[in-house]
Protein backbone atom coordinates (compact mmCIF):
# COMPACT_ATOMS: atom_id res chain seq x y z
CA UNK A 1 0.00 0.00 0.00
CA UNK A 2 2.96 2.29 0.75
CA UNK A 3 6.75 2.10 0.60
CA UNK A 4 9.36 2.39 3.33
CA UNK A 5 10.62 5.09 5.64
CA UNK A 6 14.23 4.92 4.41
CA UNK A 7 13.10 6.09 0.95
CA UNK A 8 10.57 8.53 2.43
CA UNK A 9 7.77 6.53 0.77
CA UNK A 10 6.06 5.28 3.93
CA UNK A 11 2.98 7.45 4.42
CA UNK A 12 3.13 9.04 7.86
CA UNK A 13 0.72 11.08 9.96
CA UNK A 14 3.42 13.70 10.54
CA UNK A 15 6.21 15.20 8.39
CA UNK A 16 9.53 13.40 8.10
CA UNK A 17 12.04 14.82 10.57
CA UNK A 18 14.91 14.95 8.07
CA UNK A 19 12.85 15.98 5.02
CA UNK A 20 9.70 17.83 6.14
CA UNK A 21 8.78 18.62 2.53
CA UNK A 22 8.69 14.95 1.54
CA UNK A 23 5.00 14.17 1.07
CA UNK A 24 4.76 10.61 -0.26
CA UNK A 25 1.58 9.26 -1.78
CA UNK A 26 0.31 5.72 -1.59
CA UNK A 27 1.85 3.17 -3.96
CA UNK A 28 -1.68 2.07 -4.80
CA UNK A 29 -4.48 4.62 -5.06
CA UNK A 30 -6.32 4.96 -1.75
CA UNK A 31 -9.75 4.75 -3.39
CA UNK A 32 -8.72 1.60 -5.24
CA UNK A 33 -7.54 -0.06 -2.02
CA UNK A 34 -10.77 0.80 -0.22
CA UNK A 35 -12.81 -0.52 -3.15
CA UNK A 36 -10.73 -3.70 -3.27
CA UNK A 37 -11.15 -4.38 0.45
CA UNK A 38 -14.89 -3.76 0.16
CA UNK A 39 -15.19 -6.13 -2.80
CA UNK A 40 -13.09 -8.76 -1.04
CA UNK A 41 -15.32 -8.53 2.03
CA UNK A 42 -18.39 -8.92 -0.17
CA UNK A 43 -16.93 -12.06 -1.79
CA UNK A 44 -15.49 -13.58 1.38
CA UNK A 45 -11.92 -13.08 0.17
CA UNK A 46 -9.02 -12.32 2.52
CA UNK A 47 -6.80 -9.25 2.12
CA UNK A 48 -3.18 -8.69 3.14
CA UNK A 49 -1.75 -5.17 2.86
CA UNK A 50 1.80 -3.79 3.06
CA UNK A 51 1.51 -0.98 5.62
CA UNK A 52 4.70 0.70 6.87
CA UNK A 53 3.64 4.18 7.91
CA UNK A 54 1.16 5.02 10.65
CA UNK A 55 -1.05 6.88 8.15
CA UNK A 56 -1.13 3.83 5.88
CA UNK A 57 -2.07 1.56 8.77
CA UNK A 58 -4.92 3.91 9.65
CA UNK A 59 -6.19 4.11 6.07
CA UNK A 60 -6.19 0.32 5.74
CA UNK A 61 -8.05 -0.04 9.05
CA UNK A 62 -10.56 2.54 7.80
CA UNK A 63 -11.07 0.43 4.67
CA UNK A 64 -11.63 -2.72 6.72
CA UNK A 65 -14.00 -0.90 9.06
CA UNK A 66 -16.15 0.26 6.13
CA UNK A 67 -16.11 -3.24 4.64
CA UNK A 68 -17.05 -4.89 7.94
CA UNK A 69 -20.00 -2.52 8.33
CA UNK A 70 -21.19 -3.16 4.78
CA UNK A 71 -20.88 -6.97 4.97
CA UNK A 72 -20.78 -7.93 8.67
CA UNK A 73 -21.38 -11.63 8.05
CA UNK A 74 -18.51 -12.09 5.61
CA UNK A 75 -15.81 -14.63 6.61
CA UNK A 76 -13.05 -12.44 5.12
CA UNK A 77 -9.83 -12.21 7.10
CA UNK A 78 -7.75 -9.06 6.89
CA UNK A 79 -4.06 -8.72 7.71
CA UNK A 80 -1.95 -5.59 8.04
CA UNK A 81 1.67 -6.39 7.24
CA UNK A 82 4.81 -4.74 8.68
CA UNK A 83 3.19 -2.01 10.79
CA UNK A 84 6.52 -0.35 11.56
CA UNK A 85 4.68 2.62 13.02
CA UNK A 86 1.24 2.51 14.64
CA UNK A 87 -0.34 5.42 16.49
CA UNK A 88 -1.97 5.08 19.92
CA UNK A 89 -5.36 5.80 18.39
CA UNK A 90 -5.18 2.79 16.09
CA UNK A 91 -3.91 0.16 18.53
CA UNK A 92 -7.38 -0.96 19.77
CA UNK A 93 -8.75 -1.07 16.22
CA UNK A 94 -6.83 -4.25 15.38
CA UNK A 95 -8.91 -6.19 17.90
CA UNK A 96 -12.12 -4.27 17.26
CA UNK A 97 -11.95 -4.97 13.51
CA UNK A 98 -10.38 -8.44 13.84
CA UNK A 99 -7.37 -7.38 11.78
CA UNK A 100 -4.19 -9.40 12.33
CA UNK A 101 -0.97 -7.48 12.88
CA UNK A 102 1.68 -9.34 10.87
CA UNK A 103 5.24 -8.42 11.77
CA UNK A 104 8.79 -9.30 10.78
CA UNK A 105 9.91 -9.17 14.39
CA UNK A 106 13.56 -9.87 13.60
CA UNK A 107 13.79 -6.25 12.43
CA UNK A 108 12.88 -4.85 15.87
CA UNK A 109 16.43 -4.41 17.16
CA UNK A 110 18.41 -1.31 18.23
CA UNK A 111 20.78 -1.60 15.27
CA UNK A 112 22.29 1.04 12.95
CA UNK A 113 19.32 0.71 10.58
CA UNK A 114 16.83 1.54 13.31
CA UNK A 115 19.02 4.40 14.54
CA UNK A 116 18.92 5.83 11.03
CA UNK A 117 15.14 5.33 10.99
CA UNK A 118 14.84 7.40 14.17
CA UNK A 119 16.66 10.22 12.42
CA UNK A 120 14.37 9.97 9.40
CA UNK A 121 10.97 9.97 11.12
CA UNK A 122 12.04 11.62 14.36
CA UNK A 123 12.89 9.97 17.67
CA UNK A 124 9.59 11.04 19.21
CA UNK A 125 7.73 9.01 16.58
CA UNK A 126 10.13 6.09 16.24
CA UNK A 127 10.58 5.49 19.95
CA UNK A 128 6.83 5.68 20.57
CA UNK A 129 5.36 3.83 17.58
CA UNK A 130 7.82 1.13 16.41
CA UNK A 131 6.76 -2.55 16.34
CA UNK A 132 3.93 -2.29 18.86
CA UNK A 133 3.50 -6.00 19.41
CA UNK A 134 2.67 -5.91 23.11
CA UNK A 135 0.22 -3.02 22.82
CA UNK A 136 -1.83 -4.83 20.18
CA UNK A 137 -1.86 -8.06 22.19
CA UNK A 138 -2.82 -6.25 25.41
CA UNK A 139 -5.72 -4.65 23.53
CA UNK A 140 -6.96 -8.10 22.51
CA UNK A 141 -5.51 -8.17 19.00
CA UNK A 142 -3.79 -10.97 17.11
CA UNK A 143 -0.09 -10.98 16.19
CA UNK A 144 1.47 -13.18 13.50
CA UNK A 145 5.20 -13.42 12.85
CA UNK A 146 6.58 -13.65 9.32
CA UNK A 147 9.93 -13.17 7.61
CA UNK A 148 9.27 -10.93 4.58
CA UNK A 149 12.09 -12.98 3.05
CA UNK A 150 14.09 -12.35 0.89
CA UNK A 151 13.75 -8.72 1.96
CA UNK A 152 15.95 -8.12 4.97
CA UNK A 153 16.78 -5.48 7.52
CA UNK A 154 19.95 -5.33 9.60
CA UNK A 155 19.39 -8.97 10.54
CA UNK A 156 19.55 -10.97 7.31
CA UNK A 157 17.53 -13.94 8.49
CA UNK A 158 14.36 -15.93 7.90
CA UNK A 159 14.82 -18.28 10.87
CA UNK A 160 11.75 -18.47 13.14
CA UNK A 161 13.87 -18.75 16.30
CA UNK A 162 15.59 -15.46 15.43
CA UNK A 163 12.24 -13.72 15.08
CA UNK A 164 10.93 -15.25 18.30
CA UNK A 165 14.00 -14.15 20.26
CA UNK A 166 13.80 -10.57 19.02
CA UNK A 167 10.05 -10.39 19.71
CA UNK A 168 10.86 -11.29 23.33
CA UNK A 169 14.01 -9.18 23.80
CA UNK A 170 14.00 -6.36 21.18
CA UNK A 171 17.79 -6.73 21.29
CA UNK A 172 20.36 -7.45 18.58
CA UNK A 173 20.90 -11.14 17.86
CA UNK A 174 24.26 -12.43 19.15
CA UNK A 175 25.54 -13.34 15.68
CA UNK A 176 25.34 -9.65 14.70
CA UNK A 177 27.63 -8.44 17.46
CA UNK A 178 26.98 -5.51 19.76
CA UNK A 179 26.63 -2.65 17.29
CA UNK A 180 23.58 -1.20 19.05
CA UNK A 181 22.68 2.30 20.18
CA UNK A 182 20.72 1.09 23.21
CA UNK A 183 20.21 -2.37 24.81
CA UNK A 184 16.52 -2.61 23.88
CA UNK A 185 14.72 -1.04 20.91
CA UNK A 186 12.31 1.61 22.23
CA UNK A 187 9.58 1.44 23.29
CA UNK A 188 10.93 -1.26 25.60
CA UNK A 189 7.51 -2.15 26.94
CA UNK A 190 6.64 -3.65 23.55
CA UNK A 191 8.59 -6.84 24.37
CA UNK A 192 6.29 -9.86 24.52
CA UNK A 193 6.48 -13.14 26.41
CA UNK A 194 7.91 -16.34 24.98
CA UNK A 195 4.47 -17.96 24.93
CA UNK A 196 3.03 -14.99 23.06
CA UNK A 197 5.87 -15.14 20.52
CA UNK A 198 5.46 -18.89 20.01
CA UNK A 199 1.73 -18.45 19.45
CA UNK A 200 2.39 -15.66 16.95
CA UNK A 201 4.85 -17.86 15.05
CA UNK A 202 2.58 -20.91 14.94
CA UNK A 203 -1.20 -21.03 15.30
CA UNK A 204 -1.82 -17.34 14.66
CA UNK A 205 0.34 -17.41 11.52
CA UNK A 206 -1.65 -20.45 10.42
CA UNK A 207 -4.81 -18.39 10.99
CA UNK A 208 -3.58 -15.75 8.54
CA UNK A 209 -3.21 -18.49 5.93
CA UNK A 210 -6.65 -19.90 6.71
CA UNK A 211 -5.02 -23.19 7.69
CA UNK A 212 -5.40 -23.21 11.47
CA UNK A 213 -7.57 -26.33 11.23
CA UNK A 214 -4.67 -28.23 9.61
CA UNK A 215 -1.42 -26.78 10.97
CA UNK A 216 -0.10 -24.44 13.65
CA UNK A 217 -0.58 -26.62 16.72
CA UNK A 218 -0.16 -30.23 17.81
CA UNK A 219 -3.67 -31.68 17.83
CA UNK A 220 -5.27 -34.95 16.83
CA UNK A 221 -6.30 -34.77 13.18
CA UNK A 222 -3.86 -32.03 12.19
CA UNK A 223 -0.80 -32.51 10.02
CA UNK A 224 2.30 -33.55 11.96
CA UNK A 225 4.32 -30.42 11.22
CA UNK A 226 6.74 -29.95 14.11
CA UNK A 227 10.28 -29.36 15.26
CA UNK A 228 12.18 -30.87 18.17
CA UNK A 229 14.69 -28.54 19.80
CA UNK A 230 17.74 -29.47 21.84
CA UNK A 231 16.48 -27.45 24.81
CA UNK A 232 13.21 -26.33 26.36
CA UNK A 233 12.96 -22.64 25.44
CA UNK A 234 11.18 -21.96 28.73
CA UNK A 235 14.26 -23.11 30.67
CA UNK A 236 16.94 -21.04 28.96
CA UNK A 237 17.78 -17.36 28.75
CA UNK A 238 15.83 -15.46 26.10
CA UNK A 239 19.16 -14.40 24.60
CA UNK A 240 19.90 -18.07 23.82
CA UNK A 241 16.72 -18.84 21.88
CA UNK A 242 18.18 -18.11 18.44
CA UNK A 243 21.21 -20.36 18.94
CA UNK A 244 19.18 -23.35 20.11
CA UNK A 245 19.70 -26.24 17.70
CA UNK A 246 16.88 -27.93 15.82
CA UNK A 247 17.29 -31.67 16.40
CA UNK A 248 14.45 -32.81 14.15
CA UNK A 249 11.99 -31.35 11.66
CA UNK A 250 8.85 -33.14 10.51
CA UNK A 251 6.39 -32.07 7.80
CA UNK A 252 3.17 -33.92 7.08
CA UNK A 253 4.40 -36.71 9.32
CA UNK A 254 7.65 -37.17 7.39
CA UNK A 255 11.06 -36.39 8.84
CA UNK A 256 12.75 -33.77 6.65
CA UNK A 257 15.72 -33.02 8.91
CA UNK A 258 17.38 -34.99 11.68
CA UNK A 259 20.61 -34.15 13.44
CA UNK A 260 22.95 -37.12 13.48
Predicted feature residues:
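Non-cysteine beta-strand/loop elements that form the S-adenosyl-L-methionine
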Residues: 1-11, 98-109, 169
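His/Asp/Glu-enriched, well-ordered alpha-helical/loop segment
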Residues: 35-47, 55-78, 82, 89-92, ...
Amino acid sequence: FDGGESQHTAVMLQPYADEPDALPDYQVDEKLVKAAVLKAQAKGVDTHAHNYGDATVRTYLDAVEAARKAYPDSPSRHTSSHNLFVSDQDIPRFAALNVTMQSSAQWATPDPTMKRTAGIVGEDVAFREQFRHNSVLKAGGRLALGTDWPAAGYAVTYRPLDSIQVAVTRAILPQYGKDQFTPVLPPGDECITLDQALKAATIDSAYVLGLEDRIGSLEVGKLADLVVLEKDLHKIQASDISTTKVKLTMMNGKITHQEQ
